[in-house]
């Protein structure tokens, strides 16, 4: 049976999109009719999306800083559940990828809860954002950001590239450690957990560093080490991610314990296979999208109200893999969806370039600029994969933080789940690390920790 989904089978209705002219308001409205990051403060006309008030969710009992974040909205009940039987009723608020999941898996469902616009960030981040209009610019060619080292560069984006650079540079914390598990799931639901320990140091938008202390043209440092299974344990990946990739491309190195050698890894980019992902994601799928923007033309289509993963506290910590991982898709009783306004950005592969995905459609949360959903198409125009980013607000930071990341292959019926956490896995543990900890010479030591 042919399970390929074509764009002609599932037509995404853009009729409900807000026109760009109506949303490109003057920067003077930031913090007034617009939130500090450029979202509409007001509720929607139906009252199904509330106004944004900037309040930080309360800390429930049982909170363990950096590890366990209990659900501040645990008392909420689903408003309704979207199933394959009634998907047509709700299709105006669904993406093509979501509709395809219902067609592929008849037992798939979305539990839709009351909307909480809980994405909030530190005041210092808002303050730097307010200074960016007229100062922050795209670098020549659009493959980087210049004129600023902090805040959200383009709270009122003029085009698709500016919107994508908001997604790439959004505030994701400071310097921290995190533990997580990745599983590449077969069609029958089998998997071998791969356990990672990661360290990150964000330079752009860091509030622990004054602008003059932020390393020039560096977005972040990233170290990823595998601790299990035994056949992969000790492998380490190091990435130095530049801000303006027209100046300096991404630098990456790997350490293989069997060879006991550190090697440069120029292929850790674009559509080369992701670490231990069994071919189910590309390197630039990590975090739903990362890296250079030079292979696509990005179009800012407008805004749309979509059921997106949001406030996914039940899914984000203390999860048992055997309860969560099922054939075809995760156990959707762990997932929470809410109606939110998202920016729709359509990316089409430039002529003369190549990529596994000929087209990507991004759905960026208006309150955080995180990509919450992405639909990916192959060279024949067929819907190939769809991905979703579940997120929570870390109410002690505060910030909107991506947790479980899912990549569904609609053609093979397989999927990849990343950043699954159980027990006392660290979610966000602040760390004191220096540039030396992210130097290639440190990789051998990292592999034996």
PLM feature spans:
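Aromatic (phenylalanine/tyrosine) cluster motif
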Residues: 12-14
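Gly/Pro-enriched, hydrophobic low-complexity segments
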Residues: 27-55, 82, 95, 223-293, ...
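N-terminal signal peptide c-region/cleavage motif recognized by signal peptidases
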Residues: 16-22
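Extended beta-strand-rich segments in extracellular/periplasmic secretory proteins, especially
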Residues: 179-228, 286-362, 372
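Solvent-exposed N-terminal domain segments of exported/luminal and surface proteins
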Residues: 27-249, 256
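Long, C-terminal catalytic modules of enzymes
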Residues: 425-449
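Bacterial N-terminal signal peptides that target proteins for export
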Residues: 1-10
């Amino acid at each position: 049976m042919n399970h390929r989904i074509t764009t002609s089978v599932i037509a995404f209705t853009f009729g409900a999109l807000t026109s760009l002219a109506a949303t490109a308001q003057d920067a003077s409205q930031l913090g007034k009719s617009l939130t500090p990051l450029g979202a509409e403060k007001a509720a929607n006309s139906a009252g199904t999306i509330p106004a944004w008030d900037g309040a930080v969710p309360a800390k429930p009992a049982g909170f363990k800083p950096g590890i366990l974040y209990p659900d501040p909205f645990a008392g909420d009940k689903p408003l309704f559940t979207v199933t394959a039987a009634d998907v047509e009723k709700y299709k105006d608020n669904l993406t093509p990828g979501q509709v395809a999941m219902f067609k592929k898996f008849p037992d798939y469902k979305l539990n839709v809860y009351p909307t909480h616009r809980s994405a909030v960030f530190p005041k210092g981040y808002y303050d730097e954002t307010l200074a960016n209009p007229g100062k922050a610019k795209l670098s020549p060619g659009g493959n980087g950001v210049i004129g600023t080292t902090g805040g959200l560069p383009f709270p009122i984006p003029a085009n698709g590239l500016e919107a994508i650079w908001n997604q790439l540079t959004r505030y994701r914390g400071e310097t921290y450690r995190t533990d997580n598990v990745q599983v590449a799931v077969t069609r029958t639901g089998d998997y071998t957990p791969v356990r990672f320990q990661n360290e990150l140091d964000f330079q752009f938008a860091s509030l622990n560093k004054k602008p003059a202390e932020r390393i020039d043209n560096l977005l972040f440092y990233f170290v990823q080490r595998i601790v299990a299974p035994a056949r992969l344990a000790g492998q380490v990946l190091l990435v130095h991610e530049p801000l303006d990739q027209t100046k300096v491309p991404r630098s990456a190195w790997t350490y293989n314990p069997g060879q006991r050698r550190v090697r440069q890894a120029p292929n850790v980019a674009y559509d080369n296979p992701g670490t231990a992902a069994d071919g189910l994601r590309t390197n630039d799928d990590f975090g739903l999208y990362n890296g250079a923007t030079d292979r696509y033309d990005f179009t800012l289509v407008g805004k749309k109200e979509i059921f997106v993963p949001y406030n996914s506290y039940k899914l984000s910590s203390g999860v048992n893999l055997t309860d969560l991982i099922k054939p075809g898709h995760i156990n959707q009783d762990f997932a929470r969806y809410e109606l939110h306004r998202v920016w729709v950005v359509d990316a089409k592969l430039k002529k003369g370039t190549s990529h596994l995905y000929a087209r990507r459609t991004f759905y960026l949360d208006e309150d955080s600029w995180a990509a919450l959903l992405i639909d990916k198409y192959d060279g024949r125009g067929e819907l190939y994969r769809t991905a979703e980013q579940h997120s929570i607000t870390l109410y002690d930071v505060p910030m909107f933080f991506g947790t479980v990341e899912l990549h569904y292959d609609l053609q093979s019926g397989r999927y990849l789940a990343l950043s699954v956490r159980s027990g006392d896995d660290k979610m966000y543990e602040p760390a004191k690390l220096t540039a030396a900890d992210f130097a290639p010479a440190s990789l051998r030591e990292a592999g034996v920790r």
